[in-house]
Design a protein with these regions (language model features):
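ABC family nucleotide-binding domain
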Residues: 4-225
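C-terminal boundary and immediately downstream tail of ABC-type ATPase nucleotide-binding domains
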Residues: 215, 222, 226-245
């Protein structure tokens, strides 16, 4: 596999209750690249994202993470998952732990980081997103935008090589979307490899290196944002963009 490819999907298929949700997806995600996946509801975007770290196991096809086929049964998937941060639509913070504990439990238990070092790194990340003063707050005391910023830096505490975002702003009030997108833009500027499922077309235009359009489980079009939005080739994509732009 090309040294510059972080993740490769080959012929990925997935069905639920006999209905094909992914129908042979091929996609290369290069190191340091931001790939944004868009498409209508039910097109398979989130399922595909969850296949990339095997939260959903493909029925057919392969997922390569660096040079390892992580769809192989003998692979220790937990070892590879630690290198892929994932941010969900509904934050998935532990409600009974304060923010600092939410952030340090992973590094302490999985990376064997000493408590003091884990807390120091967590506080530096909280400082970076302007939430150091909320270290001892609980998730229920935070706004949606604050929770999602915490969810992002919590994932970063594990020092991932890739970040996967599953509609990170869709559960937020409109005025909170910008603060979360800003954190993601900052990550992109630092050349973090990112795969983002989103409805935020402005983010896709501004930040993506590649934009991918999925519809009915099929990768219909993939291109750089200026071509993808400015000169779409696929008729279904033209129709979709006409409704959302």
């Amino acid at each position: 596999m090309n040294d510059n490819v972080a993740i490769r999907a080959e012929g990925v298929c997935k069905s639920f209750d006999g209905k094909g949700v992914l129908k042979g997806i091929d996609l290369d995600i290069h190191k340091g690249e931001v790939v944004v996946i868009i498409g209508p509801s039910g097109s398979g975007k989130s399922t595909f994202l969850r296949c990339l770290n095997m939260l959903e196991v493909p029925d057919a096809g392969h997922i390569w993470f660096h040079d390892v086929d992580i769809t192989e049964k003998k692979v220790n998937i937990d070892h590879h998952r630690q290198k892929m941060g994932m941010v969900f639509q509904h934050f998935n913070l532990f409600p009974h732990m304060d923010i600092l504990k939410n952030m340090t439990i992973g590094p302490e238990k999985l990376l064997n980081l000493p408590k003091e070092e884990a807390e120091k790194e967590a506080m530096a990340l909280l400082e970076r997103v302007g939430l150091a003063d909320r270290a001892h707050s609980y998730p229920s005391q935070l706004s949606g935008g604050q929770k999602q910023r915490i969810a992002i830096v919590r994932a970063l505490c594990m020092k991932p090589e890739v970040m996967l975002f599953d509609e990170p702003t869709s559960a937020l009030d409109p005025e909170m979307v910008g603060e979360v997108l800003q954190v993601m833009k900052d990550l992109a500027r630092e050349h973090m490899t990112m795969v983002v499922v989103t409805h935020e077309m402005g983010f896709a235009r501004e930040v993506a290196d590649q934009v991918v359009f999925l519809d009915d489980g099929i990768l219909m079009e993939q291109n750089r944002p200026e071509e993808f939005f400015g000169n779409p080739q696929n008729e279904r994509l033209k129709s979709f963009l006409g409704k959302v732009l």
